[in-house]
């Protein structure tokens, strides 16, 4: 098990029935415990697996699934029917379950013992039809779940379970997430608006607005010794421009950036996991927060520019899902295109706020003018994103529901150096092509603010959408405009109906 999530756990619940007798049930318990321990030992799984005693009655099932729902440590449940477990016994428990569930369809052994198999073996190893009975009742009750079929010794199986666990972790983080919104939405912008009451009802996230001068007070309460220490950290970590170093003519700008970072950290320490800013509402701040935002994102905080709390929530959620994985996750915005026929690419960036977790090299720390915000020149980290497979994820409020849009991409090196671009950036090739990708994104109403991740897989995002009951449109190598339009029409009907199921 990875060491990053030490407080969270997944419960492993095995179903059977008393009909088999105590000897068989003892074997079921022994083998299911061994299977759970094998999962717990897998490096593919980011969360501890905790075996629970075999359940054989409706009351026992209800008790364990109620306990899972109320446990602050439990972020999800894996279920497995080692033998046949009559599924009517599961109705009350499944109806009470409020945590993500994975139905694992497996068996204890790998091979059939052809030479020795007898009815005792057949009586014990009945997952082939026990899980079918369980699958029926889940579908009959419209239980949202992920289903994984495979032996636990197969790395494909553990990888798939690990992916679901990460989705469950993201959903758990979102259920308790608090976002500090400094100022309001950028004036007249549509897609960054949204229903915060519905967001808290649907996802659990709490979004509240604070005056930017509440932040400014925290910023200007920072002491000089704190700033000195952080400036030294900058010089030890990044390629700091000479003009920003101690004795340089712009060193005061670096100190101001450090002051803003420390003030932000002090403010957010009061239980916040994400935040937003707005260049139209900077109050007494002397710089638009740039370096501070980048470093806070690198530490796992969610961020959205121009009051975009939905993207801020998704940055935090995806970062949680990606903890311990190679790659990174950042706030992002599509900026401009290279439309060279046959090699079309998208250049993504923002005014300042791109997370260095996606950097392909040591970032340089620089100061440059910024034409908006009417403040002093802000300091920022400058770099280009490392190449690799990734996903660009957006969230929008469709009025009747939230919609996630995910485009599978390949992050690539820029075609040439970018000596005059004073901000961090990423260049990517979208699937299946630039034209189909952008047509689909526009048809979906996808936002211009997004999350770029090279850590979290599309499969994990799909599991997250299932867990949270959120629409997800994936744009990948199989997408065509015609089929994508059809999917959106079907989804519109489904989600209107599902809201009442």
From Swiss-Prot:
Q: How is the cofactor bound?
A: Binds 1 Mn(2+) ion per subunit.
| Gene Ontology annotations for the cellular component aspect, listed alphabetically | cytosol
Q: Which cofactor does it need?
A: Mn(2+)
Top-level taxonomic group = Bacteria
Residues that bind Mn(2+): 306, 333, 350, 449
**Catalysed reaction equations from the record:** beta-L-arabinopyranose = L-ribulose
Q: Which Gene3D superfamilies match?
A: 3.40.50.10940
Q: Which UniProt keywords apply?
A: Arabinose catabolism, Carbohydrate metabolism, Isomerase, Manganese, Metal-binding
Group of enzyme by EC: isomerase
Q: What does the record give as EC number?
A: 5.3.1.4
Q: InterPro entries, per this entry?
A: Ara_Isoase_C, AraA_central, AraA_N, AraA_N_sf, Fuc/Ara_isomerase_C, Fucose_isomerase_N/cen_sf, Lara_isomerase
Record pathway: Carbohydrate degradation; L-arabinose degradation via L-ribulose; D-xylulose 5-phosphate from L-arabinose (bacterial route): step 1/3
UniProt-listed Pfam families = AraA_central, AraA_N, Arabinose_Iso_C
Q: Which family does it belong to?
A: Belongs to the arabinose isomerase family.
The family database entries (PANTHER family) matched by this protein are listed as: L-ARABINOSE ISOMERASE
In Swiss-Prot or TrEMBL terms, this protein is called L-arabinose isomerase
């Amino acid at each position: 098990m990875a060491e990053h999530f030490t407080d969270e756990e997944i419960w492993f619940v095995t179903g059977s029935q008393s009909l088999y007798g105590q000897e068989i049930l003892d074997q079921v318990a022994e083998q299911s415990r061994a299977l759970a321990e094998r999962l717990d030992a897998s490096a593919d799984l980011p969360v501890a697996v905790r075996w629970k005693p075999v359940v054989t009655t409706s009351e026992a099932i209800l008790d364990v699934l109620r306990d899972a729902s109320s446990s602050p440590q439990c972020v999800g449940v894996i279920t497995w029917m080692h033998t046949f477990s009559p599924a009517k016994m599961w109705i009350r428990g499944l109806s009470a379950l409020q945590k993500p569930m994975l139905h694992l369809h497996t068996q204890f052994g790998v091979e059939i013992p052809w030479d020795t198999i007898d009815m005792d073996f057949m009586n014990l190893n009945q997952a082939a039809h026990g899980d079918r009975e369980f699958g029926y009742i889940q579908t009959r009750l419209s239980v949202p779940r992920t289903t994984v079929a495979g032996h636990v010794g197969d790395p494909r199986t553990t990888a798939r379970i690990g992916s679901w666990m990460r989705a469950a972790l993201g959903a758990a983080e979102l259920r308790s997430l608090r976002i500090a919104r400094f100022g309001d939405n950028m004036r007249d912008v549509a897609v960054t608006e949204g229903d915060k009451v519905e967001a808290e009802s649907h996802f659990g996230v709490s979004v509240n607005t604070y005056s930017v001068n509440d932040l400014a007070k925290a910023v200007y309460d920072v002491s000089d010794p704190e700033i000195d220490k952080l400036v030294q950290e900058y010089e030890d970590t990044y390629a700091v421009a000479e003009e920003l170093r101690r004795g340089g003519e712009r060193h005061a700008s670096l100190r101001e950036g450090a002051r803003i970072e420390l003030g932000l950290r002090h403010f957010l320490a009061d239980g916040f996991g994400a935040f937003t800013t707005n260049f139209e509402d900077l109050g007494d701040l002397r710089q638009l927060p740039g370096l501070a935002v980048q470093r806070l994102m690198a530490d796992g905080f969610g961020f959205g520019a121009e009051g975009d709390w939905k993207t801020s929530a998704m940055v935090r959620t995806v970062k949680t899902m990606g903890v311990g994985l190679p790659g990174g996750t950042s706030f992002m915005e599509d900026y401009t295109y290279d439309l060279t026929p046959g090699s079309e690419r998208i250049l993504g960036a923002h005014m300042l706020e791109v997370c260095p977790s996606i950097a392909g090299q040591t970032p340089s720390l620089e100061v440059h003018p910024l034409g908006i915000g009417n403040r002093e020149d802000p300091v920022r980290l400058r770099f280009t994103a490392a190449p690799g497979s990734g996903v660009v994820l957006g969230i929008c409020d469709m009025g009747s529901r939230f919609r996630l849009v995910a485009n599978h991409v390949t992050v690539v090196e820029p075609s040439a150096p970018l000596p005059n671009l004073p901000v961090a950036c990423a260049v990517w090739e979208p699937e299946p092509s630039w034209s189909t990708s952008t047509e689909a994104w526009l048809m979906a109403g996808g936002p211009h603010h997004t999350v770029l991740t090279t850590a979290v897989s599309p499969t994990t995002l799909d599991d997250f959408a299932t867990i949270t009951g959120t629409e997800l449109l994936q744009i990948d190598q199989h997408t065509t405009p015609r089929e994508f339009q059809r999917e959106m029409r079907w989804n519109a009907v489904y989600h209107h109906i599902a809201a009442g199921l």
